[in-house]
Amino acid sequence: MGLCKCPKRKVTNLFCFEHRVNVCEHCLVANHAKCIVQSYLQWLQDSDYNPNCRLCNIPLAARETTRLICYDLFHWACLNERAAQLPRNTAPAGYQCPSCSGPIFPPTNLAGPVASALREKLATVNWARAGLGLPLIDELVSPEPEPLNTSEFSDWSSFNASGSPEQEETASASAAPAFYSQVPRPPASPSRPEQHTVIHMGNPEPLTHASAPRKVYDTRDDERAPGLHRDCDDDKYRRRPALGWLAQLLRSRAGSRKRPLTLLQRAGLLLLLGLLGFLALLALMSRLGRAAADSDPNLDPLMNPHIRVGPS
């Protein structure tokens, strides 16, 4: 068990193997969506982990992922393809985790951020909607492209290359999606050419979807005061020496800044030092006086002639 370092400060037994911090389910969905997360006890037994998807052996950070209720992480495309290969009459219990053979569908009475995110993801495909008890959705079937008729282009001599630039731009604009921006036309003058429409042929959607670099949630702060205790995750589980607390105490005392004493504090300090010196002087004089009395022959009863000690 551990305490999550998010503002919720919840007690959890989940542990991120990559960042080596305790995480709750809210942080698991929001900040550790592509991290290997299991129980803290399992991390104590074996801290090694595989950052690749177990279905395609490709790093998890390269594609979109989904996390099951057993906290195993897979690529959503790999999991969807694997489940779509099963027969359509497969019972919900037949859809199992490829790693631990646990159920893919979360129970109806299970609530939490992980279960909610999994239900939202499963509701996008028909094989999972049937297991969740939801109505099926219409699958869009992409039409096959028709073969081009090359007979129409056999006579290339009929191709008219003397078309005007305005016609070429109009034809290209109608054939491909484009963003149009009309440039204001200045007043016509005989010395300046006529302004034309500028066509931006940029694609509104990016061609490649590159995953953003993963954030490293490091709880260490390098700008702390030298006297404060550093709760470093790397040194959290290292064996500490027996007298480490004494060295840390001396280091914190030596690194603290010295503030000037006020007049009242100085007077109190002098009074305390004087009292301690007076008590030390009394103890010293008492010890010396007792030693002198023990060695004084006048105080020895056996040396007194008026005292006779004999057999009784």
UniProtKB/Swiss-Prot annotation:
Compositional bias per record (Polar residues), positions renumbered to this chain: 148-173
UniProt gene name: ZFPL1
One BP term from GO: vesicle-mediated transport
Domain notes: The B box-type and RING-type zinc fingers although degenerate play a central role in function of the protein.
Superkingdom of this protein's organism: Eukaryota
Phosphoprotein is among the record's keywords: yes
Topological region Lumenal: 290-312
Biased composition (Basic and acidic residues): 215-233
Cytoplasmic membrane side: 1-268
Function recorded in the entry: Required for cis-Golgi integrity and efficient ER to Golgi transport. Involved in the maintenance of the integrity of the cis-Golgi, possibly via its interaction with GOLGA2/GM130.
Main localization (coarse): Golgi
Family: Belongs to the ZFPL1 family.
ZnF (B box-type) residues: 1-43
InterPro entries for this protein: ZFPL1
Subcellular compartments: Golgi apparatus, cis-Golgi network membrane
Oligomer and partners: Interacts with GOLGA2/GM130.
Post-translational events: Phosphorylated.
Gene Ontology terms: cellular component: Golgi apparatus; membrane
UniProt GO molecular function: zinc ion binding
Organism: Bos taurus
Keyword match Zinc-finger: yes
Protein name: Zinc finger protein-like 1
